[in-house]
Amino acid sequence: MVEADRPGKLFIGGLNTETNEKALEAVFGKYGRIVEVLLMKDRETNKSRGFAFVTFESPADAKDAARDMNGKSLDGKAIKVEQATKPSFESGRRGLPPPPRSRGPPRGLRGGRGGSGGTRGPPSRGGHMDDGGYSMNFTMSSSRGPLPVKRGPPPRSGGPPPKRSAPSGPVRSSSGLGGRAPVSRGRDGYGGPPRREPLPSRRDVYLSPRDDGYSTKDSYSSREYPSSRDTRDYAPPPRDYTYRDYGHSSSRDDYPSRGYSDRDGYGRDRDYSDHPSGGSYRDSYESYGNSRSAPPTRGPPPSYGGSSRYDDYSSSRDGYGGSRDSYSSSRSDLYSSGRDRVGRQERGLPPSMERGYPPPRDSYSSSSRGAPRGGGRGGSRSDRGGGRSRY
């Protein structure tokens, strides 16, 4: 990195502190015309620091002087004479490191950004809905209050997707569950339509997220592992909640309609599983009164809900049409009408509505709440579904 200073400039080191510019000029002047003699002095004492720079007009003269004078004695001291080099701070070396540094941090930042983007990415992969779901959840959570924090960040990333998801949800409902979708709409209409609608939209989002459920789940788990865990504890309730509320309530219908077609029922189930695993949903649900009350019962289900439910879901998903279908249909239908309202209301959106629909809710809540999730659900499902067991 050392660069030679301008040609003709010599560094003279090891000088006697008594040697001055005139002496240097006298000694080196015999090699050629000297342009400058710079004796380095201490700022405070103004004494020679023992080295100087002599600049010759001709580089050739400088070379001769360096060759002849290097190691010679001047004023009793052997001096060192060589081509002057630029100080390291002037060489540009100093400049270079900063660029790397500046670059480095940006890289890190970029990486960080990329990472964050990546995290977002997966969810979006899962589906915008996932994000949407998150946002919805978050939204819901926010309505709940505590949950929002956990989900807060995701919502941002998910924020945009939610919008998409909501639309997608409706689309799904229109396509797959045209009938149901309308139903959900009706439900929405029914209790505090405005309130519900927001929920429904969220649900839609949820649905979509659930569809994306996997991704949601993944994203959730990855994103909100902690929350998922927390939610897991919660999860059970939320799940129930989800099932009940969502599944049963119009949301389920909505889900079914939306999530349904998209999920193929699969999504829905998965949504549920997602919820369980996601936990955020659970949390959200948890926030809901029902899930809260139910949590204890559901406590066990969480794990069960997560795995078995998943399985159930899977099976039901596969046989989703059949068992779940009936389940969902019975549930959704029963739920949709009663639970729908109840579920929505239960969610705590329209408490008044909730109260209005106590009966469905009771049955619904009793099934979900009273029994552990698995049991309750199974029971409720069978009740709802008729003989159909959960599966």
From Swiss-Prot:
Cross-link (Glycyl lysine isopeptide (Lys-Gly) (interchain with G-Cter in SUMO2)): 22, 80, 86
One GO cellular component term: spliceosomal complex
Keywords: Acetylation, Activator, Glycoprotein, Isopeptide bond, Methylation, mRNA processing, mRNA splicing, Nucleus, Phosphoprotein, Repressor, Ribonucleoprotein, RNA-binding, Spliceosome, Transcription, Tumor suppressor, Ubl conjugation
Tissue: Both isoforms are widely expressed.
Biological function: RNA-binding protein that plays several role in the regulation of pre- and post-transcriptional processes. Implicated in tissue-specific regulation of gene transcription and alternative splicing of several pre-mRNAs. Binds to and stimulates transcription from the tumor suppressor TXNIP gene promoter; may thus be involved in tumor suppression. When associated with SAFB, binds to and stimulates transcription from the SREBF1 promoter. Associates with nascent mRNAs transcribed by RNA polymerase II. Component of the supraspliceosome complex that regulates pre-mRNA alternative splice site selection.
Residues modified to N6-acetyllysine: 30
Modified residues (N-acetylmethionine): 1
PANTHER family attached to this UniProt entry: TRANSFORMER-2 SEX-DETERMINING PROTEIN-RELATED
Domain of life: Eukaryota
Free-text comment on this protein's domains from its UniProt entry: The RRM domain is necessary for RNA-binding, but not for splice site selection, indicating that its splicing activity does not require direct binding to RNA.
Transmembrane segments: none
Annotated SUPFAM superfamilies: RNA-binding domain, RBD
Entry-annotated residues carrying Phosphoserine: 88, 91, 165, 174, 261, 328-330, 332, 352
Protein encoded by which gene: Rbmx
Gene Ontology biological-process annotations: mRNA processing; RNA splicing
A GO MF term: RNA binding
Modification N-acetylvaline, positions: 2
Biased composition (Pro residues): 151-164
Positions carrying Omega-N-methylarginine: 125, 144, 164, 172
Organism: Mus musculus
Region described as Disordered: spans on this chain: 62-391
Chief place where the protein resides: nucleus
CDD domains linked: RRM_RBMX_like
Biased composition, class Low complexity, residue ranges: 323-337, 362-371
Ranges of compositional bias, category Gly residues: 109-120
This protein's name: RNA-binding motif protein, X chromosome
Induction (free text): By high-fructose diet.
